[in-house]
Regions:
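Short hydrophobic core segments
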Residues: 12, 145-156
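Core beta-strand elements of the Rossmann-like FAD/NAD(P) dinucleotide-binding domain
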Residues: 5-7, 141-150
């Protein structure tokens, strides 16, 4: 091996996790190396050409609030934007951007190449270097050696990956890229537990071969949206999407050929995602449904490739063509890329601390799909956490761990390191018990102060945040202090808006709480002053959902007591009496950092936690006596 260079941080893999990890470490002052199998692969979108959606948009907003890049990149390369779940409450509003995949890759590669302290190199990593029980670098297939104080694995779906299409199986990565061969075996050699998962992607079809008039048009929102608090809210709609459906003919062809599907023929052994099933799985599992919706989405501005969302499959090519041509608008379809399944290795995330550092190998971190998640947003969020914590550890500072009540990112990481992943993990709003206070609209109010305190949020972004916070506080101050008396002109205005007149002096916030009332109506009819649009949106939600928010905040205070009760890192769980064997074994493996985390481990009962609390108090008493 030939020593090429020495860094503070080395990031293996330049997908969505790797880019955020490398950018975070470099921006926090660490000399960083980002490696990739191909420079043409940086921040590639191997599956859907989109960012955001239910649960995921919250992650993107939080990444942005902490100083990450994904939100800005998504805004810069969007070809359509829509706010989903508008018929539900604001806790589950979800912004989704249709992305230009090529532009997204180019944008992120340019950011990486122009970031101080950051080198980007095309290498195939074969081994991690371990000395004295610590990870201290990497070796490449060309016998190059790079040393570092921390290594972050962001290998995505590339570890010993296998492409599967019908009877055809071959070693390969997504979209015809090379797989990462050798690194998985090396990780096993160092005592790490490896799982194997499966995911899939639909075919890409030629737009020119489609009859779009036979489908339902899906346009972007007329309102202006943005993921990043640094981006201008403007019209980003440049392309349309379309909606169509499968039918009984489609399903009949799939049923007739079901034993040619690799999963049903016993050729796929990796565990697939429950929330993103293949079309053959949908037909089998939901036999009562006579159709399934398909969204036809552009891959970019300068390509005719269209992504068929909802049609993931690993069926043989002839079967793919047969069922595609039964779909309205697809009668003459031409495939440009076939659908496929991909199997890949990953680390069991139960081997990680909440900092995403590997428990058994200090100095080694893991983030993204190599931890068992699915999706670009989940990967990017983990990359950010790993990059931040690697930098903080090198700088001798306290770790950065977001609690479940502070961010969706906190729930994501906690679920992974506490409960593990028995299938590709997908973030959903239902995974957070605090979703009413963890909305996408208040991500910066929750997290930007934290990002600034660790040195990731720059002064320009922080100044904008302070200005936005000031505008919100001004709006809140007005709505809390302004009162209206039951004057004739006031009551006439209220009645004209379809709401009850006043009988006594009433606070503006109480009027705003009325279901039929908005602040824009109060401006128009009651002469209320104008405030910043985003501040008004935030203020309305705060006021209208005040009671629910107060209840969640009370639950947060209760949970915080358990989270603040820290567990010693050297606790000998196996020697504790009065705790079930299963609980002792799981806590010994997971090494929870707090009583709160220990209580969330599957198999650890409330009785086990009660006994553990006694041990912790006894230990504190002994230390105090010393």
């Amino acid at each position: 091996m030939y020593l090429i260079d020495t860094y503070d941080v080395i990031v293996v893999g330049a997908g969505h996790a790797g880019c955020e990890a490398a950018l975070a470490a470099a921006r926090m002052g660490c000399r960083t190396l980002l490696t990739t199998i191909s420079l043409d692969n940086v921040a590639m979108m191997p599956c859907n050409p989109a960012v955001g959606g239910p649960g995921k948009s919250h992650l993107v907003k939080e990444i942005d609030a902490l100083g990450g890049e994904m939100g800005i990149a998504a805004d810069a390369t969007a070809v359509q934007m829509r706010m989903l779940n508008r018929g539900k409450g604001p806790a589950v509003y979800a912004l989704r951007a249709q992305s230009d995949k090529g532009a997204y890759h180019r944008y992120m590669k340019n950011v990486v190449e122009n970031t101080d302290n950051l080198d980007l190199k095309q290498v195939q990593v074969m081994d991690i270097i371990v000395e004295d029980g610590k990870c201290v670098g990497i070796n490449t297939e060309l016998d190059e050696e790079y040393r570092a104080k921390a290594v972050i694995l962001c290998t995505g779906t590339y570890l010993d990956s296998m492409i599967i299409i019908g009877d055809t199986m071959y070693s390969g990565g997504p979209n015809g890229m090379r797989p990462s061969v050798g690194l998985s075996a090396n990780l096993k050699k160092h005592g790490l537990e490896i799982l194997r998962f499966k995911t899939g992607t639909p075919s890409r079809v030629d737009r020119r071969s489609l009859h779009l008039e036979g489908m339902e048009l899906e346009e972007g929102d007329p309102e202006n949206h943005a993921f990043s608090f640094m981006s201008e809210r403007k019209d980003r709609n440049k392309r349309n999407c379309w909606l169509t459906y499968t039918n009984e003919k489609t399903h009949d062809i799939i049923r007739e050929n079901i034993m040619r599907a690799p999963k049903y023929a016993g050729k796929i052994h990796g565990i697939g995602a429950r929330y993103c099933p293949s079309i053959e799985d949908k037909v089998v599992r939901f036999a009562d449904k006579d159709r399934h919706q398909l969204f036809v989405e552009p891959e970019g501005l300068d390509t005719t490739e269209m992504y068929v969302q909802g049609m993931s499959t690993s069926m043989p090519i002839d079967v793919q063509y047969a069922f595609l041509r039964t779909i309205p608008g697809f009668e003459d379809v031409k495939m440009m890329r076939p659908a496929y399944a991909i199997e890949y290795d990953l680390l069991d995330p139960l081997q990680l601390y909440p900092t995403l550092e590997v428990i058994k190998l200090p100095g080694l971190y893991s983030a993204g799909q190599s931890n068992g998640t699915s999706g670009y947003e989940e990967a990017a969020a983990q990359g950010l956490v790993a990059g931040i914590n690697a930098a903080l550890k090198i700088q001798g500072k306290d770790p950065f761990i977001l609690a479940r009540h502070e961010a969706y990112i906190g729930s994501l990481v906690d679920d992974l390191v506490t409960k593990g992943a028995d299938e590709p993990y997908r973030m959903m709003t239902s995974r957070s018990e605090y979703r009413l206070i963890l909305r996408q609209d208040n991500a910066d109010l929750r997290l930007t102060e934290k990002g600034h305190s660790i040195g990731l949020v720059g002064e320009e972004r922080y100044a904008r945040f302070l200005e936005r916070k000031k505008k919100y506080e001004e709006a809140m101050d007005y709505i809390r202090t302004q009162r209206f008396t039951p004057k004739e002109e006031i009551n006439r205005a209220l009645e004209s808006m379809g709401t009850a007149p006043l009988t006594t002096g009433t606070g503006a916030d109480q009027i705003l709480k009325r279901p039929e009332m908005t602040y824009w109506k109060m401006m128009e009819m009651l002469g209320c002053p104008a405030f910043d649009e985003e501040a008004v949106e935030e203020m309305e939600i705060t006021v209208k959902y005040e009671g629910y928010i107060a209840r969640q905040e009370a639950a947060v205070r209760k949970a915080a007591r358990m989270e603040n009760e820290k567990l010693p890192p050297d606790m000998d769980y196996l020697s504790l009496d009065g705790i079930s064997t299963e609980a002792k074994q799981k806590m010994d493996k997971i090494r929870p950092l707090s009583l709160g985390q220990a209580a969330r481990i599957p198999g650890v009962s409330p009785a086990d936690i009660s006994v553990l609390m006694v041990y912790v108090k006894q230990r504190k008493g002994k230390k105090g006596a010393e």
